[in-house]
Amino acid sequence: MNNIVPIAPSRGKVPESEKVTINLGFVDLGHIDLLVSEGFYANRTDFIRTAIRNQLTAQNDAVRQVVARKMLVLGLQRFGRAELEAVLAAGETLEIRVLGLASIDDDVPPALAQTTIASVRVLGAFHASAAVKAALAGRMH
């Protein structure tokens, strides 16, 4: 099985972020609003993004070790019809392991994805058509 596939060239606009909804206690939210009103942060989103970045920086060494141990691709990995047809022609299958965004282009038929992708493990976001996601449902971890 082939574990590493080169990142395909961009075929369109890829979203730069994924929306996340969180529930906060009223007191925590009040503290955030106080810091925003005092000019420490531009808005709530700025505070939350800064807090997340600070935590990720604090845990950076542990994250790097896990990424290496689990052989994860860091960032964006896209798969198009041509790439998957080449995998099929070579008689291989892929184990997709991504920390970031894994994207399967809309031109990929579900049967091709099912034949060429052995497993999918994404820490972050996975973008694919509903039909491709359904075809890979039993292989997603």
Located regions from the model:
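Short, positively charged interaction helices/loops
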Residues: 57-91
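Detector for repetitive beta-architecture
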Residues: 71, 76, 95, 101, ...
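Extracellular beta-strand scaffolds
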Residues: 78, 83-85, 102, 108-110, ...
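Short amphipathic alpha-helix starts
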Residues: 17-34
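Short helix-capping/hinge SLiMs at alpha-helix to coil transitions
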Residues: 38-39
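Short, basic amphipathic alpha-helical segments that act as recognition/interaction helices
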Residues: 2-13, 30-31, 42-66
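Compositionally biased, non-globular sequence tracts
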Residues: 136-141
